[in-house]
Swiss-Prot record:
Protein name: Serine/threonine-protein kinase PknK
Keyword Cytoplasm on entry: yes
Keywords assigned by UniProt, alphabetized: ATP-binding, Cell membrane, Cell wall, Cytoplasm, Kinase, Magnesium, Membrane, Metal-binding, Nucleotide-binding, Phosphoprotein, Secreted, Serine/threonine-protein kinase, Transferase, Virulence
Record note on disruption phenotype: Deletion affects cell size and cell wall composition, increases survival during persistent infection in mice, and increases resistance to acidic pH, hypoxia, oxidative and stationary-phase stresses in vitro.
Subunit structure, as described in the record: Forms oligomeric complexes in solution.
Binding site for ATP: I32, G33, R34, G35, G36, F37, G38, V39, V40, K55
Annotated PROSITE patterns: PROTEIN_KINASE_ATP (PS00107), PROTEIN_KINASE_DOM (PS50011)
Positions annotated as active site in the UniProt record: D149
Length: 1110
């Protein structure tokens, strides 16, 4: 991606520009780049507390170039608002006469930077970017603007990973003026051949540049990148004469390569006719390849709906690199921002005074029935807090928040939207560890907020929708344990689900109820006359206030009716003080005055909690759904949308409830059909959880199950196990248990979450379901092979390996006929079984065989494989290799998520070896992080490292109580999971640390035993028990110590040092300990000398320290 910098010699801008920017109202001025006609600075606008990029023109602008700049800004102004074109925030002239333009600052930099740092993009991500940029170019072309320099460096990435086209510094309104003959305004590697040959740029040349940009994203370099030492003219000749390199050789789908080739065709006539055509072709490629189909936002005229709506993908955003992921849980941006009011707000000073008096109390509770203006007041208070410098997050509660994990995920996301650096990795913890991580996440969040020393408030709107006790307990924990840096502002119908009593006793509660929320006459006058545009006499205002009991919703509906020509006197005669009567009367006075087409549209559009043009069109069976929504919004019909996501709409809850009641008059069959349409639209556009919800609401649970089953591999393979299990919980149990594929997906999710018992249950149900399913024999064989691999994983988790090879045989005999996750997991499982049989040399070829499949699984298979390599190397005393393997595994796991299960697994094993090599501090940090998250299962070697070595580290640090707690928890885990080898390790460590064992346990350990040699796990368990017996005897009288010495010698002699080097070394050290304990100092020194040398050579210093020999 090498390009000539045409401005390399223009770095002489007058140095007082930063001073002029400060004078213009900008702070923290920092130069970040040069291009176009000047320099780009990163600044802060104090008035809005936001970072911006300011582009300042250079000093040598002549009149024509100045006119060009101003024309550029007019073009940009006409394009502002498109989601994939950078918005122009301000244009002005500095004190020295230099024009400047202000745009949002993009901290994530450009697509070029992303590619340079992380390499080529996945083809699915590239298609997604291509569709969006095609929409941006089409929008520009429709207003007569050519970009002229589309390339990765001119595509910036928003904080949400969305691409935005920028730098129209060489763009101009078509026909405005011509660039001097022979001057190429653009980057050669991305410029169309005809432009290089002297032709004027056209929309077709922008299409070529878009294709060249996508080629670069797919390969990591330009199609005609300038070679080392190559002259520019030679590069031009290659671009104009040679075909582009064949992308099929990169392993890309043929239709992906063909689409790029057509966009980069040598002759303009052979390219797609418009940028929109490019976008539609890329969408067709997405559809054929079974990936999520992106929408291509284009400007539309009122009443005209284009072929595909622009909003279907708006809530399905993802990061700028890698494969797109389904959000967890999938949520619209509207959830994290108060809805934009349909009219002006009324200032309610008496209520904000109450809130202000609440100071920094942990909870501000605003509670009243629907329609009292709770959310509006919270939004106003949010604005006031923001002006005072607080960071204020917003979270609107919906039914999905009745799942504790999803609620916490939403809470973290809302906070990250106002403080992106807070809780960066905690969301991933929730996804992988589910319910177990709740307390850890909340504690970590409280600590981070406190340590950040920054005031944060979170508005939690509509809390009454939560009935789940675990979710309520989570919020209660946050309120009980939070600090005064964090304040929660909760709106709800009541006080239910909140620890109001405790907070009131501690003076941590400020409260506003329905009595306070009711409008008084002055406030009602402001609402009806000032904001509502009416001219009601004071007497009528007072009468309306009295008859509505100051209910904000009723007053708003009354204003709407009166603006439509209603008579105030007649309106007042029809009102009573009962809220239900007011609600029904005023709602019908609004709805029944509408034309039938609009009334019918509002009824059907209310079926879903949120809607957009495409969805509303599908529900109503029309093509202009977006125009109808905009018309309803324009007429103030209680339809709201947010500033940052204008494509999605939501009805005011009270009005939506009324519409639902009216809709139900048409019969349940009609409502069910609308839910079916909604389910179909959501499923087609990639919103699984909403598709499932509406299928269930339609009374079609079979379709809901089908939807999840069809999507069964996507969520687990993206490590969205908790999301999958939460969605499955919504489905009828009787239907879930009868679906073989779905049970297999549930088993995968539970295995990946380290939950062997639920996984085994799912596998058992799988067999029953498969026996009843009418599937082709080949399909059944594939599913059984996959299930057997999962059973093998469950076996090794249970510390049994006898059946593992048989269970893996089918999958390992035909790996290429199965999904990559199956042979990839099989290879890891076979390797772990080999370790348990002391066949360490066999581990490496097994993992080499599995590696190609693990690369297609994502990072998790690679993390496990590196851990297994490290375990084999450690047992062979190849300490250098083991450390490298564990470090690699930890680095890859941490890249997935700092608190991911993969990182913690690798971290525990790395910590064990760090401890043995003397790095107590490093081992302690890793062990503490692993221990806090908890785990329901896993291989015994991982659990032993976590509990046993974790306890040993605590003891070495002087925390004997912490060590005992670790061992106690480990002992409970061993009993619960039925793991004798783990129990033996726990008992052995208790003896080492001087923790007394129950008499019966000690007696069993002291009894003579024969160590089996035909089963590796039984061998290790018996050896641990014999080690424990030796240590117990060593603490006794002289006769016992002599017996200990004899048994230790026999134990060491029985271990084959060539086959099991580490075990042999550990047994030798134990024998030396007993020799010293019996007073045989000379013998002990003689045996210690070679052992000490070996430990020093290997760096295993801690082995001798723990034995008291160093």
């Amino acid at each position: 991606m090498t390009d000539v910098d045409p401005h390399a010699t223009r770095r002489d801008l007058v140095p007082n520009i930063p001073a002029e920017l400060l004078e213009a109202g900008f702070d923290n001025v920092e130069e970040i780049g040069r291009g176009g006609f000047g320099v780009v600075y990163r600044c802060v606008q104090p008035s809005l507390d936001r970072a911006v990029a300011v582009k300042v023109l250079s000093t040598d602008l002549d009149r024509d170039n100045l006119e060009r700049f101003l024309r550029e800004q007019r073009a940009m102004g006409r394009l502002s608002g498109h989601p994939h074109i950078v918005t122009v925030l301000q244009v002005g002239v500095l004190a020295g006469g230099r024009p400047f333009i202000v745009m949002p600052y993009h901290a994530k930099n450009s697509l070029e930077t992303l590619i340079r740092r992380h390499g080529p993009l996945d083809w699915r991500e590239t298609l997604s970017i291509g569709v969006k940029l095609a929409g941006a170019l089409e929008a520009a072309h429709r207003v007569g603007t050519l970009h002229r320099d589309v390339k990765p460096g001119n595509i910036l990435l928003t904080d949400y990973g969305e691409p935005q086209l920028t730098d129209f510094g060489i763009a101009r309104i078509a026909g405005g003026f011509e660039t001097a003959t022979g001057v190429i305004a653009g980057s050669p590697a991305f410029t169309a051949p005809e432009v290089l040959e002297g032709a004027s740029p056209t929309p077709a040349s922008d299409v070529y540049s878009l294709g060249a940009t996508l080629f670069c994203a797919l390969t990591g370099h330009a199609a005609y990148e300038r070679r080392s030492g190559e002259r520019v003219i030679a590069q031009f000749l290659r671009i104009t004469s040679q075909p582009i390199p064949d992308l099929r050789k990169q392993g890309l789908p043929a239709d992906v390569a063909a689409a790029i080739e057509r966009a980069m065709a040598r002759h303009p006539a052979d390219r797609p006719a418009t940028a929109a055509d490019v976008g539609e072709e890329l969408r067709d490629v997405q559809r054929r390849n079974g990936v999520s189909v992106d929408e291509m936002p284009l400007p539309v005229e009122l009443g005209v709906e284009r072929r595909r709506s622009p909003e279907a993908h708006a809530a399905h955003r993802h990061t700028g690199g890698g494969t797109p992921t389904v959000p967890t849980p999938p949520t619209p941006a509207t959830k994290y921002r108060p809805s934009v009011p349909t009219g002006s707000l009324v200032t309610r000073s008496r209520l904000t005074d109450i809130l202000r008096a609440g100071g920094r109390r942990r909870l501000i509770l605003i509670h009243a029935p629907s329609g009292f203006g709770k959310s509006t007041l919270a939004a106003q208070w949010r604005e006031e807090l923001s002006r005072d410098g607080a960071a204020v997050a917003w979270l609107t509660i919906d039914n999905d928040d009745n799942n504790e994990v999803w609620f916490l995920s939403h809470l973290l996301e809302s906070i990250r939207r106002v403080r992106p650096t807070l809780a960066e990795s905690l969301g991933h913890v929730l996804e992988e560890h589910g319910d177990d991580a709740g307390r850890y996440v909340l504690t970590s969040l409280i600590d981070e907020i406190h340590e950040n020393d920054d005031r944060i408030a979170v508005v939690i709107d509509d809390w009454h929708r939560v009935s789940d006790s675990r979710t309520q307990a989570a919020l209660g924990f946050l309120l009980d344990n939070g600090c005064h840096h964090l304040q929660l502002i909760v709106t709800s119908w009541s006080r239910a689900g909140l620890p109001v009593g405790r907070l009131r006793i501690g003076d941590e509660l400020a409260e506003i109820d329905s009595a306070a929320l009711r409008f008084d006459t002055d406030e009602a006058a402001a609402l009806l006359n000032d904001a509502g545009g009416l001219r009601l006499p004071r007497a009528d205002v007072q009468a309306l206030t009295t008859s509505t009991d100051g209910w904000a919703a009723a007053l708003r509906l009354a204003a709407l009716s009166l603006r439509g020509g209603g008579d105030a006197t007649q309106l007042l005669r029809g009102l009573s003080g009962a809220s239900d009567v007011i609600h029904e009367f005023l709602s019908e006075n609004v709805l029944d005055t509408l034309e039938p087409e609009l009334r019918e549209f509002l009824l059907v559009a209310s079926v879903t909690e949120r809607t957009c043009g495409g969805l509303a069109s599908a529900l109503a069976g029309i093509t202009n759904g977006r125009a109808m929504l905009e018309e309803a919004e324009h007429r103030g019909l209680f339809l709201q949308r947010t500033e940052d996501d204008p494509n999605w709409f939501r009805f005011h809850q009270m009005f939506a409830d009324f519409l639902h009641r009216r809709l139900e008059r048409g019969g349940s069959h009609r409502v069910a059909e609308l839910h079916r349409r909604a389910s179909a639209w959501f499923a087609e556009n990639g919103y699984l959880h909403e598709a499932v919800d509406h299928a269930l609401a339609a009374g079609d649970p079979a379709r809901a199950v089908d939807l999840v089953e069809q999507d069964e591999t996507n969520l687990p393979e993206q490590s969205k196990m908790t999301t999958l299990l939460a969605i499955v919980q919504k489905l009828p149990t009787s239907m879930v248990v009868s679906r073989a594929r779905l049970q297999l997906a549930i088993a995968w999710a539970n295995i990946l979450l380290q939950r062997p018992a639920p996984a085994t249950g799912a596998l058992n149900r799988f067999e029953t379901a498969l026996g009843r399913a009418e599937l082709p024999e080949a399909t059944q064989a594939d599913l059984r092979a996959e299930a057997d691999v999962l059973r093998a994983v469950a076996e090794v988790f249970a510390d049994r390996v006898e059946r593992v090879d048989d269970l893996l045989a089918e999958a390992m005999s035909r790996p290429d006929t199965l999904p990559p996750r199956v042979p990839g997991t099989a290879g890891n499982t076979a390797a772990l079984a080999a370790i348990c049989r002391f066949e360490f040399a066999e581990v490496y070829p097994l993992l080499d065989w599995a590696a190609p499949y693990q690369e297609m699984m994502g990072p998790f298979g690679t993390v496990y494989a590196q851990c297994l390599r490290g375990m084999a190397a450690r047992n062979r005393l190849d300490i250098v290799a083991a450390l490298q393997n564990f470090r690699t595994a930890f680095e890859v796991g941490t890249a997935v998520g700092a608190h991911s299960h993969a990182a913690r697994l690798a971290g525990s094993l790395l910590a064990e070896l760090l401890y043995e090599t003397g790095d107590l501090a490093g081992a302690g940090r890793l062990m503490d992080e692993s221990y806090l998250l908890g785990s329901e299962g896993g291989a015994v070697d991982y659990l032993a490292a976590r509990y046993v070595i974790g306890a040993r580290v605590k003891a070495a640090q002087g925390d004997h109580e912490g060590a005992a707690d670790r061992l106690s928890t480990g002992g409970d885990t061993a009993v619960q999971l039925g793991l004798p080898r783990l129990a033996a390790r726990i008992n052995n460590e208790r003896i080492r640390l001087g923790i007394a064992l129950p008499a019966a346990v000690a007696a069993d350990l002291l009894a003579p035993r024969t160590i089996p040699r035909d089963n590796g796990i039984a061998t290790m368990t018996a050896e641990l028990d014999e080690d424990s017996a030796v240590r117990l005897l060593s603490a006794g009288d002289s006769a016992d110590r002599d017996q200990a010495c004899q048994r230790a010698g026999a134990l060491a002699a029985a271990i084959d040092g060539t086959r099991r080097p580490l075990a042999a070394l550990q047994a030798q050290i134990l024998h030396i300990e007993t020799l010293a304990a019996t007073g045989r100092e000379s013998d002990a020194r003689n045996e210690l000398a070679p052992v000490a040398t070996k430990c020093a050579e290997l760096g295993l210093s801690r082995l001798l320290v723990d034995a008291g020999l160093a």
